[in-house]
Amino acid sequence: MNNHTSFTSSWIESFILKGKIEDNFSFITKTFTVILCSLILVLSAKIKVDLYPVPMTLQPLAILMISMLCGRNIAVATVSLYLFQGMIGLPVFAYGGGLPYLMGPTGGFLFGFLVASLIIGELADRGWGKVLFKSVFAMMLGMLIIYLFGIVQLSMIKGFEFAILKGMQPFIIGDFYKLILASILLPQIWKLTKISK
């Protein structure tokens, strides 16, 4: 039996392969996709509302969409590249870059992006992006992971109460709307490309 029956292609693979029975697409295509998605993450970091110490950005929405559309491997590679760029000092984060930034108050959210992309991307590879309630659950789980990592690191620096008041409460409503927007967009993208089963 073909192993392809256990897993389904991500949207990006299905879109590029046009329904062909293949396990992977080319290394060059994957690399280009990862670079493009990392640029989207950079841009989403720069669209922000200045709050202290955690800015409100479009990055959670970008993480949700990239992970659900591209699957685990590309999503994890994208976030890894993004974090590496920031770690070596490139100004890709909301307020710059550098290793101290990752170790600072907002670093936990950035590390949460990596774990969230792994979990959401894995579920997307299993076809969850094609089913509304499954995609919503996957993205809610991803959001919770981002909050968990962010709150833990922020509380270690500023205290738990501060972390909840400044690192969680101001973002709940906005992230809820981002989740709703992603949930609306995903099925439409599958339908528009005519690859939804």
Language model regions located:
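Short helix-capping/hinge motifs at transmembrane helix termini and TM-loop junctions
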Residues: 45-52, 70, 89, 94, ...
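Alpha-helical transmembrane segments in multi-pass membrane proteins
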Residues: 33-44, 63, 67, 78-86, ...
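Non-cytosolic membrane-interface motifs at loop->transmembrane helix junctions
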Residues: 55-60, 97-105, 162-171
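Residue-level recognition of membrane-helix boundary sites in multi-pass small-molecule transporters
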Residues: 73-74, 107, 134, 162
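Membrane-embedded alpha-helical hairpins and interfacial helices in multi-pass inner-membrane proteins
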Residues: 129-197
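Interfacial aromatic-anchored transmembrane helix boundaries in multi-pass membrane proteins
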Residues: 45-55, 83-116
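Short helix-perturbing small/polar motifs within transmembrane alpha-helices
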Residues: 3-22, 29, 43, 99-148
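Hydrophobic transmembrane alpha-helices
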Residues: 2-76
